[in-house]
Amino acid sequence: MGESQSKQESNTRVAQHGSQQDVDPTFQTKRALERERSSPQVEQSFLGQLQSLLGWSSTSKDVPLSQLIREMDHESRRHSHQSKKKLDRSEHISEGTIPEIYEKRKETISHTQSMEQKYLFQNFTKLLLLQKCCPGGSEKLVRESWHPCVPEEGGHMIEIQDLFDPNLDTEKKPQLVIIEGAAGIGKSTLARQVKRAWDEGQLYRDRFQHVFFFSCRELAQCKQLSLAELIAQGQEVPTAPTRQILSRPEKLLFILDGIDEPAWVLEDQNPELCVHWSQAQPVHTLLGSLLGKSILPEASLMLTARTTALQKLVPSLGQPHRVEVLGFSEFERKDYFYKYFAKERNTIIDFNLIGSIPVLLTLCEVPWVCWLLCTCLEKQMQQGEVLSLTSQTTTALCLKYLSLTIPGQHLSTQLRTLCSLAAEGICQRRTLFSKSDLCKQGLAEDAIATFLKIGVLQRQPSSLSYSFAHLCLQEFFAAMSYILEDSEEAHGDMGNDRTVETLVERYGRQNLFEAPTVRFLLGLLNTREMREMENIFACKFPWETKLKLLRSIIGEPFCQPCHLGLFHCLYENQEEELLTETMLCFPLTASGPNHMEATVFQTNVKRLVIQTDMELMVVTFCITFSHVRSLRLKGKGQQEYKLTAPAMVLYRWTPISEASWKVLFSNLKCTRNLEELDLSGNPLSYSAVRSLCTALRQPGCRLKTLWLVDCGLTSRCCSFLASMLSAHSRLAELDLRLNDLGDNGVRQLCEGLRNPACNLSILRLDQASLSEQVITELRALETKNPKLFISSTWMSHMTMPTENTDGEESLTSSKQQQQQSGDKHMEPLGTDDDFWGPSGPVSTEVVDRERNLYRVRLPMAGSYHCPSTGLHFVVTRAVTIEIGFCAWSQFLHETPLQHSHMVAGPLFDIKAEHGAVTAVCLPHFVSLQEGKVDSSLFHVAHFQDHGMVLETPARVEPHFAVLENPSFSPMGVLLRMIPAVGHFIPITSITLIYYRLYLEDITFHLYLVPNDCTIRKAIDEEELKFQFVRINKPPPVDALYVGSRYIVSSSKEVEILPKELELCYRSPRESQLFSEIYVGNIGSGINLQLTDKKYMNLIWEALLKPGDLRPALPRMASAPKDAPALLHFVDQHREQLVARVTSVDPLLDKLHGLVLSEEDYETVRAEATNQDKMRKLFRGSRSWSWDCKDHFYQALKETHPHLIMDLLEKSGGVSVRL
């Protein structure tokens, strides 16, 4: 019997924790990742894991592991080797380091501790955790689906070590932590992790002396227990006498896992009647007293329960910390697959299969579904089948699992019996069954043995009871039981009515659609799934039974608020007829006979809070069958546009995965009534834009308006947008503002706009950073196509939300700027070093050039962004900010993090008045495209007097990390490196080209460096010493890898030394790598190229023309305000400017709003000739400040560059103030 049980546990991959009997598949992996790593079978799987961790595409699959290892530096391999541990095969591996000291989500590493390198290695299944707000106590524990007004912030993401951190509002440490979430999402996994981490000395040792873990399903088997017996059950090994344990109740933590599973009512008894700790009492009374604080009021508790069960579970829970488990991130989903199939040679094939089906990848955010999918793939391998999964729902995946595991149809009768057992258990809230329970139900001994062997059932080793492998699996079998019963019912609708009554009695009408059993039931009533059931059970189901049962379950939900659970049920069902009938009956239509414009406060704009990829998928799937005409996915800092009713606004505060974007856009291929889509404020990767444009090109897509404001789009995305414009005739309005498209990107858009099939009538984009040539192309397009209106306002490249006086979120410098500017094509433009804010550019002052110190005086509350540095501040009032450029080498070498973290952005020393800055964006150069790097690996390092502090950013965007309510010191972004991966991190890089003319010979210097403003500035200053001038050319489009080598080549015979460039990070104070290129005669031009040395693919090229080569500009002289005798450049050359400026109107457009008022602007324009306009302009300039004349000079340089260059050469300098 023992041997059989051991074999059964091996086959079913049962993971157990001490006395815990409940199997959670998130602990179930096939083998430990590092077992026999040197064997040839493991090499391919280890390579697969590297590819999963880095998000490498399948094109890298033929790279030998040995070659990858050789390319990692010695230090990385040493760290990797030390950090790997051989784990029990039942544990799920998720490598990472957890610092020893935590304080409000920060880790402090003092200089003395840094030498010791006290890193604690953990192997946790990493889950997404959302700390939820609970302002009014626990009277509203369940998240509602519909919101009549704009919802408040939904909380913030935390990690396992933050569960007992003080409340941000009260600063009190919580005594009660509720771990909530959907079925199978990983609540029990998290609870076990807390216990195991405490056992291993990694978490909460300073707070708790004793931690007790209890499975409530097991506790429910006990009739009575004393407090002493309860404590004894919670310890694997007795550690101290009970009296000693109870002497310090504030040091105790009780973990109650699955407190909602048993059918008990936890009632707190009268404190005056409390019995002695050694006296037995009913278990539900004992637990109720613990929760009600009648006994051990100072003790802490952690509960796990499904979200829908919380409200009725305990009437009053005081002020708990509520943490919702959101499942796996996309990164962890892929990682799980690799670790499950650690030794299989087909690991890469499996990954490509799963990655190619984004719906499956989205479903796998639920850890239980991850296990289910991997089990199905494993069964297919064992049976020699071609690996193929086309399941679109969890129900379909469960049926696939059943068909792969049930050995033939001879067990169909016993399988029906097992379904009846499951349904009876669900109705009675029982998950453990005795041997007699199974026999009474009619299960034979051989059938029980078979179900144990294939893993559907499992035996509890600490008792004689049995359970299903997972509660969700029991609920699936229960759902099949209801269909089997209804198909056998001989009394017409009585079976349907009885089923619905049973479900309502068990779950309640309000939570009916949240119950997994009901979702499975709706999924089984799909035509395809019913055929699969017929094959499994060798029977036929009457189709009228299906239709009647569907309508009985759905009932009349249309008069009630829409439930997110109902969307889940409809998604599981997938029947178009039912979806259309149900969704068209929702009260989403406008109040009048005609469609009307709706603001966000109108009742016909519905709001729904979604937290996970799965929720986003099911909601957008169902919306395509409804009356909804406008859909907004609200991102951070998004401007509110008017939506056409009926409309829906989806609120989400957690990142959206690549797979989820693909699913969402796939749903848009046939939109029926949906005409407007607003994705503003949501970062879109290159692949996401590609999926979006693919959907928009489909004939069934009816979208007419698309808002993509501040989505992190680059010129690389514009090829897809242009192709979409050429093929999609319905799209009439496209908003691309606050995206860094550049000249190349806009030129690609112009190609799409020229296509006769393009029906676009309104295009909004920023033109402030575009060249005059591109702006001319846009104007020519408007002239050629009178129906096309290209709208532009000047504004910063990024925006962030600020709060107005009503506490509502608004977008700084967007709508207000549009009104101020009159929506002109050209707006005033400052230099790249300026900070762009609500009232225009704000100049940056040089405090000490040698020490790289600068100052900016922000004049009012709002959002300010500097394109040159990438810094972004949100301030509540006027404030002066000092900014210093620092070098990481000054600070990082004194900490142990130089081996575990890599520099991910520039280091700034920022000083500002405390409380004036509510948010700061710190730039980073790590590429987040394609989901290759997990954003949870980012930290912001603060270097303070007492040591270094690592802070977790509030969020990480494609180009910057956001800190809210920051404190300032030397600070910058770091990225935690994954052990054994080393420096294989994709980064955004730039090329810098400098030249020097000597007679007819030209010398070029070519650099390839990370996109770091401090490095760029250091190179600029070094090259200037030798009179080299920089040429601006576009950077590489694709992300590159640190440590990679590239071949420098040219279209002409030139001398290049060296001929290879390595992309590496060097501190700004160190010498940077470059190639020197000697050209005798440039002729008509020269083409420079960089080619990947390993894969020989072209990664960058640039054409250098003779027109790019101009004499070096003399350094601009500083002109302080107390030196009036020094004339400004525009005053020195007044006569020449009046005579030679040939195009005054563009010049006036640039000065309008900054230098010229509306009245001055019109007065100058009213003059007849250009010379008269210039004379009028100079007459008004007598009252201008030096700053105004600086703006005049900048405008002249933009509109008449050749004239300004000629004047500079003749005068030998220019007097403006930097």
Curated annotation (Swiss-Prot):
Protein localization: Cytoplasm, Cytosol; Cytoplasm; Nucleus
Regulation: Activated by pathogens and other damage-associated signals: activation promotes ubiquitination and degradation of the N-terminal part, releasing the cleaved C-terminal part of the protein (NACHT, LRR and PYD domains-containing protein 1a, C-terminus), which polymerizes and forms the Nlrp1a inflammasome. Nlrp1a inflammasome is inhibited by DPP8 and DPP9, which sequester the C-terminal fragment of Nlrp1a (NACHT, LRR and PYD domains-containing protein 1a, C-terminus) in a ternary complex, thereby preventing Nlrp1a oligomerization and activation.
Site (Trigger for autolytic processing): H942
Annotated S-S bridges: none
Annotated SMART domains: LRR_RI (SM00368)
EC number(s) on file: 3.4.-.-
CARD domain sequence ranges: 1122-1211
Protein keywords: ATP-binding, Cytoplasm, Hydrolase, Immunity, Inflammasome, Inflammatory response, Innate immunity, Leucine-rich repeat, Necrosis, Nucleotide-binding, Nucleus, Protease, Repeat, Ubl conjugation
Example of a GO biological process term: regulation of apoptotic process
Protein name from the UniProt record: NACHT, LRR and PYD domains-containing protein 1a allele 4
Organism: Rattus norvegicus
Gene that specifies this protein: Nlrp1a
